[in-house]
């Protein structure tokens, strides 16, 4: 009985294989490290180019950056509040741009052309380590926001409006980073896998509209993550009466 011609392409689809670098006792995930810094470098280059010659009438990259600045400012002001939103704009903006560029970079850049000894390159946000790290950073940020603005009064939140809420709000502190990390990871990984499988099955036809749909959902996921991060920070600094 002969082997089906469809078996080999599916066998070549690598899921869960990683390239690791060992530096002393530290084990670094090479794929995420490389793609993250490539995309961060591209983002920094865009910012430098857009702000090199600032004009009163913005054009090109400067116009794009000013649009993003206004968008992030409105997002932070709406979710965090007028009082302290300016302090958190850089953080929310960095989260949004990094996730957005990572998601789109995974979809648009032909990473598979770069061969690795093990695994393959892809969106940093398609790796659970990246999304968990971002989610934990958000958790630390809203704890810091609450304590820095209210001091020990922040813990009144856990018994507001009634002490019965204490166990539920403690559980909520664990579910927030879990939902943030797994939502982002699951959506981006699923998008990459669907496109990869369709490329094997129906190359050059069906994957194209799916890729455009993936770009849309990738942008939405970046917006959801940044919006929830800002909302959690706003919730932490909100005064309860």
Curated annotation (Swiss-Prot):
In terms of domain of life, where is this protein from? Bacteria
A single GO CC term, please? proton-transporting ATP synthase complex
The record's section on Pfam families has:
ATP-synt_A
The record's listing under Gene3D superfamilies reads: ATP synthase, F0 complex, subunit A (1.20.120.220)
Chief subcellular site?
Answer: membrane
Among InterPro entries, the record links this protein to: ATP_syn_F0_a_bact/chloroplast (IPR045082), ATP_synth_F0_asu (IPR000568), ATP_synth_F0_asu_AS (IPR023011), F0_ATP_A_sf (IPR035908)
Q: How does it sit in the membrane?
A: Multi-pass membrane protein
Parts of the chain that traverse the membrane? 30-50, 91-111, 128-148, 193-213, 214-234
Q: Where is the protein found, in the record's own terms?
A: Cellular thylakoid membrane
Any one GO molecular function term: proton-transporting ATP synthase activity, rotational mechanism
Keywords for this protein: ATP synthesis, CF(0), Hydrogen ion transport, Ion transport, Membrane, Thylakoid, Transmembrane, Transmembrane helix, Transport
SUPFAM superfamilies the UniProt entry points to: F1F0 ATP synthase subunit A
Assembly state and interactors? Answer: F-type ATPases have 2 components, CF(1) - the catalytic core - and CF(0) - the membrane proton channel. CF(1) has five subunits: alpha(3), beta(3), gamma(1), delta(1), epsilon(1). CF(0) has four main subunits: a, b, b' and c.
Q: Which NCBIfam families match?
A: ATP_synt_6_or_A
Record function comment: Key component of the proton channel; it plays a direct role in the translocation of protons across the membrane.
* Sequence similarity: Belongs to the ATPase A chain family.
Q: What is this protein called?
A: ATP synthase subunit a
Tell me which species this is from: Prochlorococcus marinus (strain SARG / CCMP1375 / SS120)
């Amino acid at each position: 009985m002969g082997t089906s011609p469809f078996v080999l392409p599916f066998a070549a689809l690598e899921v869960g294989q990683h390239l690791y670098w060992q530096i002393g006792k530290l084990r670094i995930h090479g794929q995420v490290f490389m793609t993250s810094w490539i995309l961060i470098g591209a983002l920094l280059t865009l910012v430098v180019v857009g702000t090199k010659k600032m004009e009163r009438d913005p054009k090109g990259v400067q116009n794009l950056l000013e649009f993003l600045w206004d968008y992030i400012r409105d997002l932070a002001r709406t979710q965090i509040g007028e009082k302290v939103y300016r302090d958190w704009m850089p953080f929310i903006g960095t989260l949004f741009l990094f996730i957005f560029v990572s998601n789109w970079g995974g979809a648009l850049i032909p990473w598979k052309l770069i061969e690795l000894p093990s695994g393959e390159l892809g969106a940093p946000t398609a790796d659970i380590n990246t999304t968990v790290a971002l989610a934990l950073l958000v958790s630390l940020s809203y704890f810091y926001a609450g304590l820095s603005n209210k001091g020990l009064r922040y813990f009144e939140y856990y018994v507001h409006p009634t002490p019965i809420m204490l166990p539920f709000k403690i559980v909520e502190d664990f579910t927030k980073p879990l939902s943030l990390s797994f939502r982002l990871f699951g959506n981006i990984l699923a998008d990459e896998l669907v496109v990869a499988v369709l490329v094997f099955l129906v190359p050059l036809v069906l994957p194209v509209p799916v890729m455009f749909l993936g770009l849309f959902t990738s942008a939405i996921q970046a917006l959801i993550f940044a919006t929830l991060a800002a909302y959690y920070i706003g919730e932490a600094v909100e005064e309860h009466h």
